[in-house]
C-alpha cells in the first residue's frame, strides 16, 4: 500500500503572509503607506456605459448600450455554466463523494431539491430547475461583486463635478487620486472618475425587474399547468355573482386583490434584491475609502452572507409561489 504524499500545509501560510506584507508595503496600516490617499468611488444608480457606440437601436425605444452590469451578467452566466459542467463531469466520473467546489455545489443542490420536494410534492421536478437556476444565478451575481478591485478597475473618463486628478502610472495605464481633487469653484482643471469594467448585475434594477417578471410569469404558468383554465377563477370568480350577489361581489373583490397581489410580487422581488445588494455595494465603497483594509474586510464577510441569503430568499419565494 503506497504512502500518501504529505500535504504542504505551510505553503498556504507563506502565500497569506506574502499577501499581508504586500498590503502593508503598498497601503500601510491605514492605507497611506505610499502617500496615496484612498478615494470615494462615484455611486451611480443605473449601469454605466462601457462603450459610447450602441449595440443596437430599437425604434420607439432608443439605443441600447453595453454596460458594466451586462458584463456582470455575462460573467454570472459563465460561472453557472462552468459549475454545471464541473458537477456533471464529477458525477459521470463515478466518484461517490465529490470534493472541492463541485462537492459544495452538489450539497447546495441537494438541499434545494429537498426543500422543493417538501414544498411542491409531485410538482417538484417541474419547479426545481427554475428554483435552482434562479438561486445559483443570483448567488453568482451577488458574490462576483465581492471580488476586490472590481469597483476601482475600469475606464477613466472626464467627470463634470467632484472628480479627481489623473496620473499616468506607466504606458497607457492611469490612476486617479485625491491630490488634484475635484474642480474647485473657479478652477478649470479637468477632473476624472472611473467607470468600472464590471459591476454586480443584481445592483441594476433592469436585471432585478426582469428576473422578477420571469419569476411571476412562471408562477402563472405553473398555475395553469396544475389547474387548467380553472386557474382564472382565482382572479375572476363570478360564479355566485347572480345567484348570491353579495358573495359574488365579495369574490369579485377578492379576485381584484389577487391581481394586485401578483403585480406587487414583481415590485417586492425586484426592490428587495436590488435594495439589499446596492446598499451593500455602497457600504463597501464608503468603508474602503475611509479605512482600506481592515474595516472593509468585516463588511465583505457580511456581504458574503447577505448575498447568499438574498439568493436563497429570492429562489425560495419563487418556488413557494409556484407550488401554491
Short names for language-model regions:
Residues 2-324:
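Selective transmembrane helix interface/packing segments
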Amino acid at each position: 500500500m503506497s504512502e500518501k504524499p504529505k500535504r504542504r500545509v505551510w505553503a498556504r501560510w507563506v502565500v497569506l503572509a506574502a499577501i499581508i506584507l504586500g498590503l502593508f508595503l503598498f497601503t500601510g496600516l491605514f492605507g497611506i503607506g505610499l502617500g496615496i490617499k484612498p478615494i470615494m468611488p462615484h455611486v451611480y444608480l443605473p449601469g454605466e456605459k462601457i462603450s459610447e457606440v450602441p449595440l443596437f437601436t430599437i425604434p420607439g425605444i432608443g439605443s441600447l448600450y453595453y454596460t458594466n452590469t451586462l458584463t456582470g451578467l455575462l460573467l454570472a452566466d459563465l460561472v453557472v455554466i462552468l459549475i454545471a459542467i464541473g458537477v456533471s463531469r464529477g458525477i459521470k466520473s463515478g466518484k461517490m463523494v465529490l470534493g472541492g467546489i463541485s462537492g459544495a455545489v452538489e450539497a447546495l443542490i441537494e438541499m434545494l431539491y429537498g426543500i422543493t420536494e417538501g414544498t411542491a410534492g409531485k410538482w417538484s421536478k417541474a419547479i426545481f430547475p427554475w428554483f435552482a437556476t434562479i438561486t445559483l444565478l443570483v448567488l453568482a451575481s451577488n458574490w462576483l461583486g465581492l471580488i476586490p478591485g472590481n469597483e476601482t478597475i475600469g475606464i477613466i473618463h472626464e467627470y463634470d463635478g467632484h472628480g479627481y486628478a489623473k496620473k499616468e502610472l506607466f504606458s497607457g495605464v492611469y490612476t486617479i487620486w485625491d491630490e488634484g481633487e475635484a474642480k474647485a469653484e473657479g478652477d478649470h482643471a479637468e477632473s476624472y472618475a472611473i467607470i468600472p469594467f464590471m459591476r454586480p448585475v443584481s445592483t441594476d434594477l433592469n436585471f432585478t425587474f426582469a428576473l422578477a417578471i420571469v419569476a411571476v410569469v412562471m408562477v402563472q404558468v405553473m398555475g395553469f399547468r396544475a389547474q387548467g383554465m380553472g386557474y382564472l377563477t382565482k382572479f375572476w370568480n363570478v360564479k355566485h355573482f347572480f345567484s348570491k350577489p353579495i358573495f359574488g361581489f365579495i369574490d369579485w373583490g377578492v379576485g381584484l386583490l389577487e391581481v394586485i397581489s401578483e403585480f406587487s410580487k414583481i415590485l417586492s422581488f425586484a426592490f428587495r434584491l436590488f435594495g439589499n445588494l446596492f446598499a451593500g455595494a455602497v457600504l463597501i465603497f464608503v468603508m474602503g475609502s475611509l479605512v482600506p483594509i481592515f474595516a472593509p474586510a468585516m463588511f465583505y464577510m457580511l456581504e458574503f452572507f447577505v448575498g447568499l441569503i438574498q439568493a436563497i430568499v429570492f429562489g425560495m419565494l419563487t418556488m413557494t409561489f409556484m407550488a401554491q
